Amino acid sequence: RMDFLATTVQEALTHPDLPARIDVVTALHACDTATDDAIAFGLAKHASHMVLVPCCQAEVAGVLRQHKALSLSRSPLAELWRHPLHTREFGSQITNVLRCLQLEASGYSVTVTELVGWEHSMKNELILARRMTDDRHGARERARQRLVQVLDELGLPELKARFAVDQLASGSSTVTA
């Protein structure tokens, strides 16, 4: 049985008609930061599964663009996003990598695959996340460390709050069975 509520993701976090735990969170072609809102909702509601098809990621590309000159002086890898088209595409790719690391650091097993063939849609990345009941040899902390390393290496430390690095370090997103 399905029920639908007309509410924002933020309001849904505390909506009295929603249970404390949600089985599945989906976000289909959720533009820009809407996928991040869905992830935050899923984490807050201890979702067992998340099915995400991100779209139009612009936030990370914007930060890359702001720091492009500094990045080019620091690392030859900044050539990956020197040109505007590459900035947009690389920003999109990195956004999804960061999302996957955030999910893994929060106790989810993550698989990334295609939704449909590339000939049908360029926005085609499907992120599947399944909540794990154990930490599997420190996988959460390794993912958290990698998340921090990627943000620092790419000159994106101001995005640590967006990807909840501090909450992950304090264990406030602890997975419960």
Predicted segments, located by residue:
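Class I S-adenosyl-L-methionine
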Residues: 1-177
